[in-house]
């Protein structure tokens, strides 16, 4: 079958031909319709330090997708041929303390689809049926293909009660923009997103965010004053991994504020911890999605009117995958969809 693989320990992704995956007793065989390119896939393409330590070569990559069930393992219940599905990209062990307690998103033995085992950039994918999520009929293939990153946004945004709150989102990548849109949709008062990438800030404006701020040109405290905010942000969603952005967030949080961190900062990031202590801030780390509460919330948010369509900016045939990766690597894109039909 046709697949996009990391064939060499160097920059690039290559189209290749690989055997179809074998279906296990507890698995689903999924015919891929559409996939989306993730920031992780760009890291793998670039063959950065993380990728060199993590990714086996050769391997089919990718973990954002929607497809159709075409094969069902003999032990599987609850699915039928023709079901339209996406899937949780973190495959968990089922036997550690967190898994047994129902906190599978905190499994210490997680294996990543397209990271530690073959991924979805292929005509067919096999995953455990436990990881599959049926897509409601009124959600498009395009939106279903970005459920994985949308889940990161939803998990982060819904970590805290947002109704009537003032929310700061640092980092206007696709996940940050989606998190800001979720916050606005569920009843936050002011949602402010910051970045230095004007293209992506304009995407945020199209999503109806209260204020998209280019911190290279505007002062965040001036924006707060413009919005009538006198005591700081109630909730912070840190999506950038940029130390300067996190320090600004700490400066502008209200006392008792709550911060959810999805962005991955450098390991040696220094901050003024006295601000955390004396402001009484609560900081929560976010990884992946809650299984499967986040997935049901994603579907419900879209069905209740959340419009994510502006975040999808580029669509290509899989044969033009290089154009898709070029768009993602340029920083001048939202989500990029690759069609396998």
From Swiss-Prot:
Q: Which GO terms describe its cellular component?
A: cytoplasm
The entry's Zn(2+) 1-binding residues are 38, 63-64
Q: Which cysteines are joined by disulfide bonds?
A: none
Q: SUPFAM superfamilies under this entry? A: GroES-like, NAD(P)-binding Rossmann-fold domains
Residues the record annotates as the site (Important for catalytic activity for the proton relay mechanism but does not participate directly in the coordination of zinc atom) are 148
Could you tell me which pathway this protein works in? Amino-acid degradation; L-threonine degradation via oxydo-reductase pathway; glycine from L-threonine: step 1/2
What EC number(s) does the entry state? 1.1.1.103
Q: Which InterPro entries match?
A: ADH-like_C (IPR013149), ADH-like_N (IPR013154), ADH_Zn_CS (IPR002328), GroES-like_sf (IPR011032), L-Threonine_3-DHase (IPR004627), NAD(P)-bd_dom_sf (IPR036291), PKS_ER (IPR020843), Zn_alcohol_dh (IPR050129)
> EC class of this enzyme?
oxidoreductase
GO terms, biological process: L-threonine catabolic process to glycine
Leader sequence residues: none
- Keywords on record: Cytoplasm, Metal-binding, NAD, Oxidoreductase, Zinc
UniProt remark on cofactor binding: Binds 2 Zn(2+) ions per subunit.
Where does the chain bind Zn(2+) 2? 93, 96, 99, 107
Which parts of the sequence bind NAD(+)? 175, 195, 200, 262-264, 286-287
- What is its subcellular localisation? Cytoplasm
Q: How does it assemble?
A: Homotetramer.
Function statement: Catalyzes the NAD(+)-dependent oxidation of L-threonine to 2-amino-3-ketobutyrate.
NCBIfam families listed in its UniProt record: PRK05396.1, tdh
Protein's UniProt name: L-threonine 3-dehydrogenase
Which organism is this protein's natural source? Escherichia fergusonii (strain ATCC 35469 / DSM 13698 / CCUG 18766 / IAM 14443 / JCM 21226 / LMG 7866 / NBRC 102419 / NCTC 12128 / CDC 0568-73)
